[in-house]
From Swiss-Prot:
Gene Ontology cellular-component annotations: plasma membrane-derived thylakoid photosystem II
Gene Ontology BP, a term: photosystem II assembly
Signal peptide, first to last residue: none
Protein name, UniProt field: Protein Thf1
Higher taxonomy: Bacteria, Bacillati, Cyanobacteriota, Cyanophyceae, Synechococcales
Length: 199
């Protein structure tokens, strides 16, 4: 019988694969994603699908904006995934495929995709906030919703959430927090850049 890995095990594996200092502004992201993926790796009713993969990539890319040295970004993502048993290549490919498809999705295509996702995920109904970001990214990439009002976009997110068996109130809250944190991160990076210029 295999021994269940602890969060300490995951962190140890992470630092072995990524033996670099993480700039302070990005440290919280790395730690939160590492812990989140560790918890998900032990959830029997969680399944890594394309919406989750898209959400994970979106969160990581948004919150590593401006990361230096830039050549460490891919290594950081790979280490966060690998130390928790997630295959970074599979996640990248799954995310890229969905985002690419979404750019030409019609409403019928979306419904077909959601129906297939539901069928594939039967018995796996665990919700992660990363799924919420995946839904938001999916809708944001669809031409159908590029010019709609925010209330109409929210209605679509509500419909998608319900079709996937998620509570819209949780999805809405997680998306709202995500947007707020992106803005805070952007402001923090602007302040850092300004301070560097004045030195």
């Amino acid at each position: 019988m295999s021994v269940r890995a602890t969060i300490s095990d995951s962190k140890s594996d992470f630092h072995k694969e990524f033996p670099y200092v993480i700039p302070a502004i990005y440290r919280k992201l790395a730690d939160e994603l590492l812990v989140e993926l560790h918890l998900l790796s032990h959830q029997k009713n969680f399944k890594k699908d394309s919406i989750f993969s898209t959400g994970l990539k979106e969160v990581f890319c948004k919150f590593t904006s401006g990361y230096k040295p830039s050549e460490h970004v891919t290594k950081l993502f790979d280490a966060i995934c690998n130390c928790n048993g997630f295959n970074p290549t599979e996640i990248n490919n799954s995310s890229e495929q969905l985002v690419s498809n979404a750019k030409s999705f019609t409403k019928e295509d979306l419904n077909s995709f959601l129906s297939k996702t539901n069928n594939d995920n039967k018995g796996y109904d665990y919700y992660s906030r990363i799924n919420a970001i995946g839904i938001y990214k999916l809708v944001s990439e669809m031409p159908l919703f590029k010019e709609v009002k925010e209330e109409d976009l929210n209605k679509e997110i509500n419909d998608i959430s319900k079709s996937l068996g998620y509570q819209y109130s949780r999805v809405e809250k997680d998306i709202s927090m995500y947007k707020s944190n992106i803005e805070k991160m952007k402001q923090a990076l602007e302040i850092i850049a300004l301070n560097l210029k004045t030195k």
